[in-house]
Amino acid sequence: MSKLKEKRGKIVVSMERVKKEEAIELARVQIEKTFGKGSLIKIGESSVGKGIKSISSGSIVLDEALGIGGYPRGRIIEIFGPESSGKTTLTLQAIAEVQKEGGIAAFIDAEHALNPVYAKALGVNVSELWLSQPDTGEQALEIAEHLIRSGGIDLIVVDSVAALTPKLEIDGEMGDSQIGLQARLMSKSLRKITGILSKSNTCIMFINQIRMRIGIMFGNPETTAGGNALKFYSSLRLEVRKIEQITRSGSSDDVIGNKIRVKIVKNKVAPPFRKVELVIYFGKGISREAGILDAALKHNLIQKTGSWYSLGNNKLGQGRESVVEYLNKEVELANDLDKRLRKIIFNNFDQEDVNFIKLKED
């Protein structure tokens, strides 16, 4: 008797489910008539649920930390930090990676400070890079919106938020009080940009500067320019800090680069709060080989015994710098290690990210 009741109960639930599905389908038809096809979809029947495409950062250790193999497409990214910490270098390296894959990038230079010679040294094809040097913040963000709506741009870099000066401020007197103008400009623009980004699959990066909040006695007095809107709308926020200078071997005064630390303070596409250290050489950009060495050591493809590094039974060299230089010369070996590492890392991340998503749902 109990089994019969249970069976009848399941039939009733099933019929209710069918009625609900029919009602939703009628609503969907009406919604699509009003707002257009694709206004209401099931995630499983669309590209939304099929993973997030990414743009490589140019460093395998940073790609690993980001969780999906690079910067997510269709999202807003903020890169912030003190002056000369490597923020622009990170974005130019991303542009170079996009162009290597046949993509198109644009650089909105609100600071009017882009150095094409340096960009070219980092691997950017400057002859194919779209450049805008706007006069006002409104102009910069409207240009970004038009580029996103075009659907033809893969990556947009805005340098920087602090330089996006509202027109009212430019037209006004030096002594005029213009409280909150930039914050309102950013909030209004980001509301418009967010909705169209995912449809165009464009990634937009905002470089930002650090400001000090006056009167803060406890806690961190640092904040970023442009108000809170960018913090909220960003899917990814990277804090970049210079931690030490790199000098030429045998010299304490001949500085050839910087070591920087990148902390992922916000990540909506993978677990956040990861930290990585990157090497940036002046005139060359991020050291891809140093990243490969660090990742290979972490995943046991390369072994270290004392000061010696070896790959299987083959010794690569003594000392970190000599091995990085060796990988720089042996391009085929470096490429092979990069491919093997990406296979190891991102096969592992698949399951980790699934667990992370389940944890968030719980």
UniProtKB/Swiss-Prot annotation:
Keyword Ligase: no
Keyword check for Nucleotidyltransferase: no
Entry keywords, A to Z: ATP-binding, Cytoplasm, DNA damage, DNA recombination, DNA repair, DNA-binding, Nucleotide-binding, SOS response
Domain of life: Bacteria
Main localization of the protein described in the UniProt heading: cytoplasm
GO BP term, example: DNA repair
Subcellular localization, as worded in the UniProt entry: Cytoplasm
Residue sites binding ATP per the record: G81, P82, E83, S84, S85, G86, K87, T88
GO cellular component: cytosol
GO MF entries: ATP binding; ATP hydrolysis activity; ATP-dependent DNA damage sensor activity; damaged DNA binding; single-stranded DNA binding
InterPro entries: AAA+_ATPase (IPR003593), DNA_recomb/repair_RecA (IPR013765), DNA_recomb/repair_RecA_CS (IPR020584), P-loop_NTPase (IPR027417), RecA-like_C (IPR049261), RecA-like_N (IPR049428), RecA_ATP-bd (IPR020588), RecA_C_sf (IPR023400)
Family: Belongs to the RecA family.
Protein's job: Can catalyze the hydrolysis of ATP in the presence of single-stranded DNA, the ATP-dependent uptake of single-stranded DNA by duplex DNA, and the ATP-dependent hybridization of homologous single-stranded DNAs. It interacts with LexA causing its activation and leading to its autocatalytic cleavage.
Annotated protein name in UniProt: Protein RecA
Species name: Borrelia garinii subsp. bavariensis (strain ATCC BAA-2496 / DSM 23469 / PBi) (Borreliella bavariensis)
Gene, per the UniProt record: recA
